[in-house]
């Protein structure tokens, strides 16, 4: 399956990660508001409701209680488009106020950063005002990130992961890698590394 197709769809990404036994947050898919509410209560509050497609944390909401969940599900149910009728519900992972973005090129990690949420938000996207800090690549992070990248088809990818009591969990893999936040804190020249990788692949 095409890498961009897999990475552009959280459902496909999750299915591949779980099949390959790459650690990922507990996720339940539902196709009606009623079954989605049951899924949320199975995972427990708080939980996270995400769109199947999209980036930058858009339409990703934290469901703190049943009342909030019912309101968000009702709103989603009124939106047009078949993809909005797929309810992608994920556990709210107990983690520090950050996640990890690793930039993977083939079989190695170019760089890794912590991404911290901006004040008043829990989402860590740099595009939403979050900020980055350098992250040491541990053996666990390297193993999980490279396995995740290989699972979706490999290449130049951004693997997003969280630290949890169960270890490193991959929650997203991006085939369009934004590295402005990483470039501002990492000593490595990420742009040059990416160019070198692309040229090397083009010569094959």
Question: How should each PLM-predicted stretch be described?
Answer:
Residues 1-26:
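Conserved N-proximal alpha/beta basic substrate-recognition cap immediately N-terminal to
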Residues 24-46:
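Rossmann-like NAD(P)H-binding beta-loop-alpha module
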Residues 47, 88, 110-111, 157, ...:
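Protein kinase-like catalytic core scaffold
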Residues 56-59, 181-182:
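A short acidic, helix-capping loop that chelates divalent metal ions and anchors anionic groups
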Residues 58-149:
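Phosphate-binding site of ATP-dependent enzymes
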Residues 102-104, 167-181:
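A short beta-strand motif that forms the metal-chelation/ATP-contact edge
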Residues 122-170, 193, 197-203:
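A long amphipathic alpha-helix within ATP-dependent nucleotide-binding catalytic cores
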Residues 179-189:
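Short, flexible active-site recognition loops that position polar ligands and cofactors
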